[in-house]
């Protein structure tokens, strides 16, 4: 049974996220056993994947409503740079994650599942599957996510993708 509190709204969820990250940042990592460090690093990677899924969905919705125009920005990418103070390179990665939400539903689902796909692997798979005709892409991505769930690494996923194409 989980003792984690479920947030009541998005603001509360963001506060909990910041609190949890702050707790981890304040740990005396030098005094932690290697096994605990490894567990934290794996957990952070999983959290990063779930955050990427959330960011992609939020950016997709923000784009649809032309939210960037309210702040006088021409595009969501420039809005990200000026309003969230990220670099252009980071904004480009966020836009790639947005594309996952809009065009690669199976890969987005793989980000949300524990330890199935990392953000970097999902983005790589999206690049590889772009060459697959649209009517077959979702099925191909489902095959790749299932292979990742079964333990396939990036090399095996590349081979599967090459075979599908």
Question: Language-model features: where?
Answer:
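Conserved C-terminal region and hinge/linker of Rieske [2Fe-2S] proteins, especially
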Residues: 1-165
């Amino acid at each position: 049974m989980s003792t984690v509190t479920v947030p009541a709204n998005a603001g509360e969820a963001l506060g909990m996220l910041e609190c949890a990250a702050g707790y981890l940042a304040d740990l005396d990592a030098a005094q932690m056993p290697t096994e605990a460090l490894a567990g934290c690093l794996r957990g952070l990677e999983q959290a990063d994947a779930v955050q990427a899924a959330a960011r992609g969905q939020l950016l997709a919705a923000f784009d649809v409503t032309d939210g960037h125009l309210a702040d006088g920005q021409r595009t969501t990418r420039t809005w990200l740079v000026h309003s969230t103070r990220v670099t252009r390179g980071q904004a480009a990665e966020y836009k790639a994650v947005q594309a996952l939400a809009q065009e690669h539903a199976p890969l987005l689902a793989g980000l949300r599942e524990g330890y199935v796909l990392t953000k970097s692997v999902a983005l790589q798979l999206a690049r590889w599957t772009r060459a697959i005709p649209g009517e077959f892409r979702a099925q191909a991505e489902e095959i790749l996510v299932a292979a990742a769930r079964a333990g396939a690494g990036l090399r095996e996923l590349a081979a599967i993708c090459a075979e599908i194409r």
